Amino acid sequence: MSEMATIARPYAKAAFDFAVEKGELSQWAQMLTFCSEVAKNEDVAQLLDGAIASEQLAEIFISICGEQLNEFGQNFINVMAENGRLKVLPGVLEQFILLQHEFEKVIDADVTSAIELTEQQKADIGAKLEARLERKVKLNCSVDETLLAGVIIRAGDLVIDNSARGRLGRLSETLQS
């Protein structure tokens, strides 16, 4: 997976820089999202693995994408096809989104709780994280009943384990040392 990220990173950076320069960040994110989904399609994936010339492959890919690609998006697909890199489009999208979030000062935060959080609790957690991280926070909430109570928050390198399971684990470690 890290090899795909290494290959995808320069393409994502080039697309990102171009999108910022043209003021078309959201349009490029939409184009790359669509192209990524096309590249993940089973039939298209078989085409990408086949022995088709890069020009033909680019033409086929662009025709599948149709109106979803503007002129610059089509050029981007042509360059990727010439270099045999259309298979890494999902990785390009991933890297592009990371760059976009960094640029827009947005961070994804995974919040795992023992029970479903209310809208007010989500708003409170989001506000506190935004103040602490000085970024806009996008919450991804999930439920894990094995936590017993409380929440675990993961945002970038930050991990806050305020679950009953986590507290019991730390208490157990303290008692054993």
Curated annotation (Swiss-Prot):
Main location: membrane
Presence of the UniProt keyword Cell inner membrane in the record: yes
Keywords: ATP synthesis, Cell inner membrane, Cell membrane, CF(1), Hydrogen ion transport, Ion transport, Membrane, Transport
GO CC list: plasma membrane; proton-transporting ATP synthase complex
A Pfam family recorded for this sequence: OSCP
Cited PROSITE patterns: ATPASE_DELTA
Entry membrane topology: Peripheral membrane protein
Family under the similarity heading: Belongs to the ATPase delta chain family.
Oligomeric form and interacting partners: F-type ATPases have 2 components, F(1) - the catalytic core - and F(0) - the membrane proton channel. F(1) has five subunits: alpha(3), beta(3), gamma(1), delta(1), epsilon(1). F(0) has three main subunits: a(1), b(2) and c(10-14). The alpha and beta chains form an alternating ring which encloses part of the gamma chain. F(1) is attached to F(0) by a central stalk formed by the gamma and epsilon chains, while a peripheral stalk is formed by the delta and b chains.
Name the UniProt record assigns to this protein: ATP synthase subunit delta
Native organism: Aliivibrio fischeri (strain ATCC 700601 / ES114)
